[in-house]
Amino acid sequence: MKQITFAPRNHLLTNTNTWTPDSQWLVFDVRPSGASFTGESIERVNIHTGEVEVIYRASQGAHVGVVTVHPKSEKYVFIHGPENPDETWHYDFHHRRGVIVEGGKMSNLDAMDITAPYTPGVLRGGSHVHVFSPNGERVSFTYNDHVMHELDPALDLRNVGVAAPFGPVNVQKQHPREYSGSHWC
């Protein structure tokens, strides 16, 4: 057994699917405080050499974390908090999304539509703990609903969802925080 990260910061592994398909790298997020969702990068470390690479760096005040790896290719999925957070829209269970990074390019996994009439295949809130299926075609996640939270926070119960590769799913934006995604949820 050996330690492979040494930088003076918190390195957090998700509790599943953190190995790259070649079993040479572990992926993690980096947080100033281990208890807060305030990390700005998704990274990986080579278990033999200790080399660290940044997979993704957030911008515009967004935070990222809870990364997992595709079982067959170098594709990463993780939580991305809102860009340009403010008093009314900041990181929260119902204000986050799943994103996929492949080949250095980031795309939204899930879409969000919080304005009626709602778009089929689109979430109304935030997703969390994204994990690829064993064949890599689907992604499981947990989910909190912004619309239900606005109605009554007690109604915003966490649910389990699946993102299927039947996208893209395009949202006709009626709210500045709505967005399109690559998968049907």
Predicted feature locations:
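Sequence signature of WD/YWTD-type beta-propeller architectures
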Residues: 1-185
